[in-house]
Design a protein with these regions (language model features):
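Helix-loop boundary and gating motifs at the non-cytosolic
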Residues: 15-164, 339-344, 348-373
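Glycine-rich segments within core transmembrane alpha-helices of 12-TM secondary carriers
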Residues: 167, 248-272, 480-491
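Helix-to-loop junctions at the C-terminal end of transmembrane segments
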Residues: 170-185, 397-411
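Cytoplasmic membrane-interface "Motif A"-like loop-to-helix N-cap segments
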Residues: 180-195, 407-421
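A membrane-interface helix-boundary motif in multi-pass transporters
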Residues: 187-189, 272-293, 496-515
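C-terminal ends and interior cores of transmembrane alpha-helices
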Residues: 193-210, 421-435
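Multi-pass alpha-helical transporter architecture, strongest
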Residues: 297-306, 509-526
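A late C-terminal transmembrane helix in Major Facilitator Superfamily
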Residues: 469-500
Protein backbone atom coordinates (compact mmCIF):
# COMPACT_ATOMS: atom_id res chain seq x y z
CA UNK A 1 0.00 0.00 0.00
CA UNK A 2 1.44 3.34 -1.04
CA UNK A 3 1.44 6.59 0.95
CA UNK A 4 -1.08 8.03 -1.51
CA UNK A 5 -3.52 5.23 -0.72
CA UNK A 6 -3.10 5.75 3.04
CA UNK A 7 -3.93 9.48 2.81
CA UNK A 8 -6.95 8.86 0.59
CA UNK A 9 -10.25 9.54 2.42
CA UNK A 10 -12.62 6.63 2.71
CA UNK A 11 -15.99 7.28 1.03
CA UNK A 12 -18.89 7.98 3.42
CA UNK A 13 -21.61 5.34 3.13
CA UNK A 14 -25.10 6.44 2.17
CA UNK A 15 -27.58 6.58 5.11
CA UNK A 16 -30.10 3.80 5.37
CA UNK A 17 -33.76 4.55 4.75
CA UNK A 18 -35.24 6.26 7.86
CA UNK A 19 -31.84 6.74 9.46
CA UNK A 20 -31.83 10.54 9.00
CA UNK A 21 -34.58 12.22 11.01
CA UNK A 22 -35.27 15.89 10.54
CA UNK A 23 -36.90 17.42 13.62
CA UNK A 24 -39.83 19.54 12.47
CA UNK A 25 -39.48 23.16 13.45
CA UNK A 26 -35.90 22.67 14.64
CA UNK A 27 -33.67 21.25 11.93
CA UNK A 28 -35.68 22.74 9.08
CA UNK A 29 -36.08 26.14 10.76
CA UNK A 30 -34.86 28.94 8.49
CA UNK A 31 -32.26 31.46 9.58
CA UNK A 32 -34.36 34.57 10.00
CA UNK A 33 -31.32 36.82 9.92
CA UNK A 34 -30.78 35.69 6.33
CA UNK A 35 -34.32 35.14 5.09
CA UNK A 36 -36.10 38.22 6.48
CA UNK A 37 -35.85 41.58 4.83
CA UNK A 38 -34.86 44.67 6.84
CA UNK A 39 -38.48 45.87 6.67
CA UNK A 40 -39.72 42.59 8.14
CA UNK A 41 -37.11 42.72 10.91
CA UNK A 42 -38.20 46.27 11.84
CA UNK A 43 -41.84 45.16 11.95
CA UNK A 44 -41.01 42.24 14.27
CA UNK A 45 -39.03 44.53 16.55
CA UNK A 46 -42.04 46.81 16.93
CA UNK A 47 -44.26 43.86 17.85
CA UNK A 48 -41.80 42.22 20.25
CA UNK A 49 -42.06 42.69 24.03
CA UNK A 50 -39.33 45.02 25.23
CA UNK A 51 -37.55 43.55 28.28
CA UNK A 52 -36.65 46.41 30.60
CA UNK A 53 -33.97 45.72 33.25
CA UNK A 54 -35.36 45.78 36.77
CA UNK A 55 -34.31 48.80 38.81
CA UNK A 56 -32.86 47.70 42.19
CA UNK A 57 -35.15 48.15 45.17
CA UNK A 58 -34.56 51.30 47.20
CA UNK A 59 -32.40 50.58 50.23
CA UNK A 60 -34.85 52.24 52.62
CA UNK A 61 -37.53 49.78 51.50
CA UNK A 62 -35.46 46.67 52.24
CA UNK A 63 -36.52 45.03 55.54
CA UNK A 64 -32.95 43.95 56.34
CA UNK A 65 -31.69 47.53 56.08
CA UNK A 66 -34.38 48.85 58.40
CA UNK A 67 -33.76 46.03 60.89
CA UNK A 68 -30.10 47.06 61.02
CA UNK A 69 -31.08 50.70 61.55
CA UNK A 70 -33.52 49.78 64.33
CA UNK A 71 -30.77 47.82 66.09
CA UNK A 72 -28.75 51.02 66.48
CA UNK A 73 -31.59 52.72 68.34
CA UNK A 74 -32.47 49.72 70.48
CA UNK A 75 -30.45 47.11 72.32
CA UNK A 76 -27.92 45.85 69.75
CA UNK A 77 -27.26 42.54 71.51
CA UNK A 78 -30.88 41.49 70.95
CA UNK A 79 -29.91 40.17 67.51
CA UNK A 80 -27.61 37.62 69.14
CA UNK A 81 -30.58 35.96 70.87
CA UNK A 82 -31.79 34.42 67.55
CA UNK A 83 -35.46 35.05 68.26
CA UNK A 84 -38.08 33.48 66.01
CA UNK A 85 -39.75 36.85 65.36
CA UNK A 86 -37.80 37.54 62.21
CA UNK A 87 -38.52 40.52 60.00
CA UNK A 88 -40.60 39.20 57.06
CA UNK A 89 -39.16 39.69 53.60
CA UNK A 90 -41.05 38.56 50.51
CA UNK A 91 -37.88 39.01 48.45
CA UNK A 92 -36.08 36.29 50.42
CA UNK A 93 -34.70 33.44 48.36
CA UNK A 94 -36.12 30.96 50.86
CA UNK A 95 -39.61 31.70 49.50
CA UNK A 96 -38.85 30.55 45.95
CA UNK A 97 -36.35 28.39 44.07
CA UNK A 98 -33.48 30.87 44.03
CA UNK A 99 -30.10 29.98 45.46
CA UNK A 100 -29.92 31.19 49.11
CA UNK A 101 -26.17 31.57 48.63
CA UNK A 102 -26.84 34.43 46.19
CA UNK A 103 -27.00 37.86 47.81
CA UNK A 104 -29.80 40.33 47.00
CA UNK A 105 -27.40 42.35 44.84
CA UNK A 106 -26.88 39.31 42.58
CA UNK A 107 -23.39 38.36 43.75
CA UNK A 108 -22.59 34.84 44.94
CA UNK A 109 -19.78 35.04 47.51
CA UNK A 110 -17.64 32.01 48.24
CA UNK A 111 -16.90 30.71 51.75
CA UNK A 112 -13.98 33.09 52.31
CA UNK A 113 -15.97 36.08 51.09
CA UNK A 114 -18.89 35.18 53.36
CA UNK A 115 -16.56 35.18 56.35
CA UNK A 116 -15.10 38.49 55.22
CA UNK A 117 -18.59 39.97 54.90
CA UNK A 118 -19.53 38.84 58.41
CA UNK A 119 -16.26 40.07 59.91
CA UNK A 120 -16.28 43.30 57.91
CA UNK A 121 -19.75 44.40 58.94
CA UNK A 122 -19.10 43.38 62.57
CA UNK A 123 -15.84 45.35 62.62
CA UNK A 124 -17.46 48.27 60.85
CA UNK A 125 -20.29 48.48 63.37
CA UNK A 126 -17.80 48.22 66.24
CA UNK A 127 -15.32 50.78 64.94
CA UNK A 128 -17.90 53.36 63.86
CA UNK A 129 -20.08 52.99 66.98
CA UNK A 130 -17.13 53.69 69.29
CA UNK A 131 -16.50 57.36 68.41
CA UNK A 132 -20.21 58.22 68.42
CA UNK A 133 -20.68 56.75 71.91
CA UNK A 134 -17.50 58.44 73.17
CA UNK A 135 -18.57 61.83 71.84
CA UNK A 136 -22.21 61.62 72.96
CA UNK A 137 -21.54 60.41 76.50
CA UNK A 138 -18.12 61.81 77.44
CA UNK A 139 -16.32 64.23 75.14
CA UNK A 140 -19.01 66.65 73.95
CA UNK A 141 -20.49 67.08 77.48
CA UNK A 142 -16.96 67.76 78.75
CA UNK A 143 -16.21 70.29 76.03
CA UNK A 144 -19.49 72.18 76.45
CA UNK A 145 -18.98 72.30 80.22
CA UNK A 146 -15.55 73.84 79.68
CA UNK A 147 -16.93 76.47 77.30
CA UNK A 148 -20.17 77.65 78.93
CA UNK A 149 -19.97 76.55 82.58
CA UNK A 150 -23.38 76.97 84.21
CA UNK A 151 -25.11 76.93 80.84
CA UNK A 152 -23.87 73.42 80.17
CA UNK A 153 -27.28 71.74 80.21
CA UNK A 154 -28.89 74.12 77.72
CA UNK A 155 -25.77 74.04 75.53
CA UNK A 156 -25.66 70.24 75.49
CA UNK A 157 -29.40 69.96 74.84
CA UNK A 158 -29.16 72.40 71.92
CA UNK A 159 -26.15 70.62 70.44
CA UNK A 160 -27.66 67.15 70.68
CA UNK A 161 -31.12 68.20 69.49
CA UNK A 162 -29.78 69.97 66.41
CA UNK A 163 -27.62 66.95 65.61
CA UNK A 164 -30.59 64.58 65.84
CA UNK A 165 -32.80 66.72 63.61
CA UNK A 166 -30.06 67.14 61.01
CA UNK A 167 -29.29 63.40 61.06
CA UNK A 168 -32.93 62.59 60.36
CA UNK A 169 -33.00 64.72 57.21
CA UNK A 170 -29.53 63.63 56.08
CA UNK A 171 -30.39 59.95 56.47
CA UNK A 172 -33.29 60.38 54.05
CA UNK A 173 -31.19 62.28 51.53
CA UNK A 174 -28.12 60.04 51.72
CA UNK A 175 -30.18 56.85 51.42
CA UNK A 176 -31.54 58.06 48.08
CA UNK A 177 -28.20 59.51 47.01
CA UNK A 178 -26.29 56.28 47.57
CA UNK A 179 -28.97 54.31 45.70
CA UNK A 180 -28.38 56.54 42.67
CA UNK A 181 -24.58 56.48 42.75
CA UNK A 182 -23.02 54.81 39.71
CA UNK A 183 -19.28 54.33 39.43
CA UNK A 184 -16.46 51.79 39.41
CA UNK A 185 -16.31 51.73 43.23
CA UNK A 186 -19.96 50.77 43.58
CA UNK A 187 -22.87 52.56 45.21
CA UNK A 188 -21.84 52.47 48.89
CA UNK A 189 -18.04 52.61 49.05
CA UNK A 190 -17.64 56.24 47.82
CA UNK A 191 -20.04 57.45 50.50
CA UNK A 192 -18.27 55.56 53.28
CA UNK A 193 -14.89 56.97 52.24
CA UNK A 194 -16.23 60.53 51.97
CA UNK A 195 -18.11 60.24 55.26
CA UNK A 196 -15.05 59.02 57.16
CA UNK A 197 -12.94 61.89 55.81
CA UNK A 198 -15.62 64.50 56.57
CA UNK A 199 -16.14 63.17 60.10
CA UNK A 200 -12.41 63.14 60.80
CA UNK A 201 -11.88 66.67 59.47
CA UNK A 202 -14.87 68.04 61.40
CA UNK A 203 -13.71 66.52 64.68
CA UNK A 204 -10.15 67.71 64.18
CA UNK A 205 -11.36 71.29 63.78
CA UNK A 206 -13.89 70.91 66.61
CA UNK A 207 -11.10 69.93 69.01
CA UNK A 208 -9.52 73.40 68.73
CA UNK A 209 -12.75 75.46 68.76
CA UNK A 210 -13.24 77.72 71.79
CA UNK A 211 -16.74 78.98 70.98
CA UNK A 212 -19.92 76.99 71.51
CA UNK A 213 -21.32 78.21 68.18
CA UNK A 214 -18.32 76.81 66.31
CA UNK A 215 -18.51 73.56 68.26
CA UNK A 216 -22.15 73.19 67.17
CA UNK A 217 -21.31 73.93 63.53
CA UNK A 218 -18.58 71.31 63.30
CA UNK A 219 -20.62 68.87 65.38
CA UNK A 220 -23.34 69.14 62.73
CA UNK A 221 -20.79 68.60 59.98
CA UNK A 222 -19.61 65.50 61.81
CA UNK A 223 -23.22 64.28 61.97
CA UNK A 224 -23.45 64.66 58.19
CA UNK A 225 -20.25 62.65 57.79
CA UNK A 226 -21.49 59.92 60.11
CA UNK A 227 -24.78 59.71 58.20
CA UNK A 228 -22.73 59.25 55.02
CA UNK A 229 -21.17 56.22 56.72
CA UNK A 230 -24.11 54.71 58.59
CA UNK A 231 -26.77 54.71 55.88
CA UNK A 232 -24.63 53.23 53.05
CA UNK A 233 -23.13 50.69 55.46
CA UNK A 234 -26.60 49.56 56.55
CA UNK A 235 -27.70 49.39 52.89
CA UNK A 236 -24.63 47.32 51.99
CA UNK A 237 -25.36 45.01 54.91
CA UNK A 238 -28.87 44.44 53.59
CA UNK A 239 -27.92 43.75 49.98
CA UNK A 240 -24.53 41.99 50.13
CA UNK A 241 -25.14 39.23 52.71
CA UNK A 242 -26.81 36.05 51.32
CA UNK A 243 -30.01 34.93 53.01
CA UNK A 244 -28.40 31.69 54.17
CA UNK A 245 -25.95 33.55 56.42
CA UNK A 246 -28.04 36.57 57.39
CA UNK A 247 -28.90 35.29 60.87
CA UNK A 248 -25.23 34.85 61.73
CA UNK A 249 -24.32 38.22 60.23
CA UNK A 250 -27.11 39.92 62.23
CA UNK A 251 -25.74 38.45 65.46
CA UNK A 252 -22.20 39.62 64.83
CA UNK A 253 -23.43 43.02 63.67
CA UNK A 254 -25.34 43.49 66.94
CA UNK A 255 -22.40 42.35 69.05
CA UNK A 256 -20.16 44.75 67.15
CA UNK A 257 -22.48 47.66 67.92
CA UNK A 258 -22.65 46.82 71.63
CA UNK A 259 -18.91 46.29 72.00
CA UNK A 260 -18.21 49.45 70.03
CA UNK A 261 -20.36 51.57 72.33
CA UNK A 262 -18.66 50.14 75.40
CA UNK A 263 -15.19 50.49 73.92
CA UNK A 264 -15.77 54.09 72.87
CA UNK A 265 -16.88 55.18 76.34
CA UNK A 266 -14.00 53.40 78.08
CA UNK A 267 -11.38 54.80 75.70
CA UNK A 268 -12.78 58.32 76.06
CA UNK A 269 -12.76 58.09 79.85
CA UNK A 270 -9.23 56.72 79.98
CA UNK A 271 -8.04 59.30 77.46
CA UNK A 272 -9.42 62.30 79.39
CA UNK A 273 -7.70 61.90 82.74
CA UNK A 274 -7.40 65.71 83.07
CA UNK A 275 -10.29 67.00 80.94
CA UNK A 276 -10.45 70.52 82.39
CA UNK A 277 -6.76 71.31 81.93
CA UNK A 278 -5.30 73.03 78.90
CA UNK A 279 -2.97 71.36 76.45
CA UNK A 280 -3.04 67.98 74.80
CA UNK A 281 -2.03 65.52 77.52
CA UNK A 282 -5.04 63.64 78.84
CA UNK A 283 -7.50 66.40 77.95
CA UNK A 284 -10.78 66.60 76.10
CA UNK A 285 -9.02 68.06 73.06
CA UNK A 286 -6.74 65.06 72.77
CA UNK A 287 -9.70 62.70 73.14
CA UNK A 288 -11.60 64.37 70.30
CA UNK A 289 -8.50 64.36 68.10
CA UNK A 290 -7.98 60.67 68.84
CA UNK A 291 -11.44 59.82 67.53
CA UNK A 292 -10.91 62.03 64.49
CA UNK A 293 -8.04 59.72 63.56
CA UNK A 294 -10.19 56.76 64.63
CA UNK A 295 -12.74 57.52 61.90
CA UNK A 296 -10.09 57.28 59.18
CA UNK A 297 -8.68 54.04 60.58
CA UNK A 298 -12.20 52.60 60.91
CA UNK A 299 -12.99 53.38 57.28
CA UNK A 300 -9.75 51.82 56.03
CA UNK A 301 -10.09 48.66 58.15
CA UNK A 302 -13.76 48.14 57.26
CA UNK A 303 -13.24 48.49 53.52
CA UNK A 304 -10.14 46.29 53.56
CA UNK A 305 -11.88 43.47 55.42
CA UNK A 306 -15.04 43.59 53.31
CA UNK A 307 -14.81 42.10 49.81
CA UNK A 308 -14.48 44.82 47.21
CA UNK A 309 -17.83 46.17 46.09
CA UNK A 310 -18.53 45.62 42.42
CA UNK A 311 -18.97 48.38 39.90
CA UNK A 312 -22.41 49.95 39.60
CA UNK A 313 -21.91 51.51 36.17
CA UNK A 314 -23.86 48.71 34.46
CA UNK A 315 -26.93 48.98 36.70
CA UNK A 316 -30.19 50.32 35.25
CA UNK A 317 -30.84 53.89 36.24
CA UNK A 318 -33.97 55.67 37.34
CA UNK A 319 -34.41 59.37 37.88
CA UNK A 320 -34.89 60.59 41.44
CA UNK A 321 -38.53 61.36 42.07
CA UNK A 322 -39.63 64.26 44.22
CA UNK A 323 -41.20 62.02 46.83
CA UNK A 324 -38.30 59.59 47.05
CA UNK A 325 -36.69 61.26 50.05
CA UNK A 326 -39.38 61.17 52.71
CA UNK A 327 -42.06 58.90 51.24
CA UNK A 328 -40.65 55.94 53.16
CA UNK A 329 -41.41 57.71 56.45
CA UNK A 330 -45.14 57.81 55.85
CA UNK A 331 -46.94 55.58 58.36
CA UNK A 332 -49.00 52.71 56.93
CA UNK A 333 -52.69 53.33 56.37
CA UNK A 334 -55.47 51.48 58.18
CA UNK A 335 -53.11 50.42 60.99
CA UNK A 336 -54.40 51.89 64.29
CA UNK A 337 -52.11 49.70 66.38
CA UNK A 338 -49.07 51.03 64.53
CA UNK A 339 -49.42 54.42 66.22
CA UNK A 340 -49.63 52.74 69.64
CA UNK A 341 -46.48 50.70 69.01
CA UNK A 342 -44.75 53.79 67.60
CA UNK A 343 -45.45 55.90 70.70
CA UNK A 344 -44.48 53.04 73.04
CA UNK A 345 -41.15 52.67 71.26
CA UNK A 346 -40.59 56.43 71.32
CA UNK A 347 -41.20 56.63 75.08
CA UNK A 348 -38.91 53.67 75.79
CA UNK A 349 -36.11 55.26 73.76
CA UNK A 350 -36.68 58.59 75.54
CA UNK A 351 -36.40 56.91 78.96
CA UNK A 352 -32.95 55.56 78.21
CA UNK A 353 -31.68 58.54 76.20
CA UNK A 354 -32.33 61.25 78.77
CA UNK A 355 -30.06 59.52 81.30
CA UNK A 356 -27.39 58.51 78.79
CA UNK A 357 -27.00 62.06 77.45
CA UNK A 358 -26.65 63.74 80.86
CA UNK A 359 -24.90 60.97 82.77
CA UNK A 360 -21.52 62.76 82.69
CA UNK A 361 -23.05 65.80 84.41
CA UNK A 362 -24.92 63.51 86.78
CA UNK A 363 -21.67 61.85 87.81
CA UNK A 364 -19.67 65.08 87.97
CA UNK A 365 -22.11 67.42 89.74
CA UNK A 366 -24.79 65.40 91.55
CA UNK A 367 -22.91 62.41 92.95
CA UNK A 368 -20.16 62.35 95.51
CA UNK A 369 -17.71 60.86 93.04
CA UNK A 370 -14.59 62.87 93.85
CA UNK A 371 -13.15 60.20 96.08
CA UNK A 372 -14.09 57.30 93.86
CA UNK A 373 -11.18 55.56 92.16
CA UNK A 374 -10.47 52.23 90.57
CA UNK A 375 -8.62 50.71 87.63
CA UNK A 376 -6.81 54.00 87.09
CA UNK A 377 -10.03 56.05 86.93
CA UNK A 378 -11.21 58.72 89.32
CA UNK A 379 -14.28 60.87 89.83
CA UNK A 380 -16.93 61.16 87.13
CA UNK A 381 -14.92 59.03 84.71
CA UNK A 382 -15.07 56.09 87.09
CA UNK A 383 -18.86 56.45 87.45
CA UNK A 384 -19.47 56.64 83.70
CA UNK A 385 -17.19 53.66 83.06
CA UNK A 386 -18.97 51.70 85.80
CA UNK A 387 -22.37 52.45 84.26
CA UNK A 388 -21.19 51.48 80.76
CA UNK A 389 -19.78 48.14 81.91
CA UNK A 390 -22.84 47.39 84.06
CA UNK A 391 -25.23 48.15 81.19
CA UNK A 392 -23.25 45.89 78.85
CA UNK A 393 -23.24 43.05 81.40
CA UNK A 394 -26.99 43.46 81.93
CA UNK A 395 -27.64 43.31 78.18
CA UNK A 396 -25.42 40.25 77.86
CA UNK A 397 -27.34 38.48 80.61
CA UNK A 398 -30.60 39.36 78.86
CA UNK A 399 -29.40 37.85 75.59
CA UNK A 400 -28.68 34.54 77.29
CA UNK A 401 -32.19 34.45 78.78
CA UNK A 402 -34.17 36.18 76.03
CA UNK A 403 -34.87 33.05 74.01
CA UNK A 404 -36.25 30.98 76.93
CA UNK A 405 -38.21 33.99 78.21
CA UNK A 406 -39.83 34.63 74.82
CA UNK A 407 -40.77 30.95 74.45
CA UNK A 408 -42.17 30.73 77.98
CA UNK A 409 -44.98 33.21 77.26
CA UNK A 410 -47.52 32.81 74.49
CA UNK A 411 -48.47 36.47 74.82
CA UNK A 412 -45.39 38.61 74.11
CA UNK A 413 -46.96 41.52 75.98
CA UNK A 414 -46.33 39.84 79.32
CA UNK A 415 -42.50 39.78 79.25
CA UNK A 416 -42.45 43.21 77.57
CA UNK A 417 -44.51 44.80 80.35
CA UNK A 418 -42.57 42.96 83.06
CA UNK A 419 -39.35 44.35 81.61
CA UNK A 420 -40.83 47.86 81.78
CA UNK A 421 -41.59 47.34 85.45
CA UNK A 422 -38.08 46.01 86.01
CA UNK A 423 -36.67 49.15 84.38
CA UNK A 424 -38.78 51.27 86.73
CA UNK A 425 -37.35 49.43 89.73
CA UNK A 426 -33.82 49.99 88.48
CA UNK A 427 -34.43 53.69 87.82
CA UNK A 428 -35.78 54.12 91.35
CA UNK A 429 -32.61 52.69 92.93
CA UNK A 430 -30.45 55.87 92.72
CA UNK A 431 -33.22 57.95 94.30
CA UNK A 432 -34.02 55.54 97.13
CA UNK A 433 -30.60 54.21 98.11
CA UNK A 434 -28.27 56.06 100.46
CA UNK A 435 -25.24 55.04 98.41
CA UNK A 436 -25.91 56.94 95.19
CA UNK A 437 -22.87 55.51 93.42
CA UNK A 438 -24.02 51.98 94.05
CA UNK A 439 -27.52 53.04 93.02
CA UNK A 440 -26.51 54.31 89.58
CA UNK A 441 -24.44 51.18 89.00
CA UNK A 442 -27.41 49.02 89.94
CA UNK A 443 -29.63 51.10 87.66
CA UNK A 444 -27.29 50.57 84.71
CA UNK A 445 -27.21 46.81 85.30
CA UNK A 446 -30.99 46.44 85.66
CA UNK A 447 -31.81 48.91 82.88
CA UNK A 448 -29.44 47.19 80.45
CA UNK A 449 -31.11 43.86 81.22
CA UNK A 450 -34.68 45.19 81.13
CA UNK A 451 -34.32 47.24 77.95
CA UNK A 452 -32.81 44.29 76.06
CA UNK A 453 -35.73 42.10 77.14
CA UNK A 454 -38.22 44.79 76.15
CA UNK A 455 -36.58 45.40 72.79
CA UNK A 456 -36.51 41.69 71.96
CA UNK A 457 -39.98 40.69 73.14
CA UNK A 458 -41.73 43.74 71.69
CA UNK A 459 -40.35 43.01 68.21
CA UNK A 460 -43.08 40.50 67.38
CA UNK A 461 -45.71 42.91 68.72
CA UNK A 462 -44.43 45.69 66.52
CA UNK A 463 -44.40 43.48 63.43
CA UNK A 464 -47.97 42.37 64.14
CA UNK A 465 -49.14 45.98 63.81
CA UNK A 466 -48.00 46.21 60.18
CA UNK A 467 -51.01 45.80 57.86
CA UNK A 468 -49.27 44.58 54.70
CA UNK A 469 -46.31 42.22 54.71
CA UNK A 470 -45.48 43.31 51.16
CA UNK A 471 -44.51 46.79 52.38
CA UNK A 472 -42.81 45.82 55.62
CA UNK A 473 -39.59 47.60 54.67
CA UNK A 474 -41.35 50.92 54.11
CA UNK A 475 -43.37 50.47 57.31
CA UNK A 476 -40.23 49.75 59.35
CA UNK A 477 -38.65 52.89 57.90
CA UNK A 478 -41.57 54.87 59.29
CA UNK A 479 -41.28 52.98 62.57
CA UNK A 480 -37.58 53.84 62.86
CA UNK A 481 -38.55 57.51 63.19
CA UNK A 482 -39.53 56.59 66.76
CA UNK A 483 -35.82 56.29 67.56
CA UNK A 484 -35.16 59.87 66.42
CA UNK A 485 -38.25 61.36 68.07
CA UNK A 486 -37.63 59.38 71.25
CA UNK A 487 -34.05 60.59 71.50
CA UNK A 488 -35.18 64.17 70.85
CA UNK A 489 -37.90 63.88 73.48
CA UNK A 490 -35.43 62.49 76.01
CA UNK A 491 -32.93 65.32 75.46
CA UNK A 492 -35.58 68.05 75.77
CA UNK A 493 -37.38 66.49 78.74
CA UNK A 494 -34.08 65.92 80.55
CA UNK A 495 -32.98 69.52 80.05
CA UNK A 496 -36.33 70.84 81.29
CA UNK A 497 -36.23 68.62 84.39
CA UNK A 498 -32.67 69.60 85.28
CA UNK A 499 -33.34 73.31 84.75
CA UNK A 500 -36.60 73.30 86.72
CA UNK A 501 -35.32 71.30 89.71
CA UNK A 502 -31.65 72.35 89.65
CA UNK A 503 -30.56 68.73 90.11
CA UNK A 504 -29.74 65.71 87.99
CA UNK A 505 -31.23 62.88 90.06
CA UNK A 506 -34.80 63.83 88.98
CA UNK A 507 -33.84 62.49 85.56
CA UNK A 508 -34.57 59.02 86.92
CA UNK A 509 -38.08 60.11 87.87
CA UNK A 510 -38.74 61.35 84.34
CA UNK A 511 -37.38 58.09 82.96
CA UNK A 512 -39.73 56.16 85.23
CA UNK A 513 -42.70 58.12 83.90
CA UNK A 514 -41.75 57.49 80.28
CA UNK A 515 -41.24 53.77 80.80
CA UNK A 516 -44.51 53.39 82.71
CA UNK A 517 -46.35 54.98 79.79
CA UNK A 518 -44.51 52.67 77.39
CA UNK A 519 -45.63 49.67 79.44
CA UNK A 520 -49.26 50.81 79.45
CA UNK A 521 -49.25 51.31 75.67
CA UNK A 522 -47.59 47.94 75.16
CA UNK A 523 -50.51 46.30 76.97
CA UNK A 524 -52.82 47.73 74.29
CA UNK A 525 -50.99 45.81 71.55
CA UNK A 526 -52.10 42.35 70.49
Amino acid sequence: MTDDNQNETMPTPQPLPGQVFIRPGIDDRPDYEKTLTPEAKAALKRLAVQQRPRVPEASNERPEVQAARLAEGGSPLTAAAHLDAAVPNLESSFLDLRDPMTAPDGSRPNALQVNRLTAGFALGSLLFAAPIAALDVVLIPQRIDQLVGDGRVAGLALTMALGMVLSFFMNAWIAVGSDHTFGPLGRRTPWIISGALLSAASLAILSVCDLLQLVIVFWLLMQIGYAMIAMPLAAAFGERVPDKFRDRADSWHGMGLALGQLLGILVAVYRTMHPAESGWDGTTRSGIMLFAIWFIVAGIVTLLVLPREGSSTYMPRESVRKGSFFSQYRPPKHAPKFAVAFIARMLAVAATTLIAVYQWYLAAFDLDADGLSGYGLTGAGAVVALMAVAAFVGSLMAVLLLGPIARAFEDARVPAVISCMLFVIGAAAPCMMADKLFGVGLYALIAGFAYAIYDGTSQSLNLATLPDVRSVGRSLAAFSVANTLGSLLGVIAGALAITALAAYLPLFGVAIGFMLLAGVLTMLLK
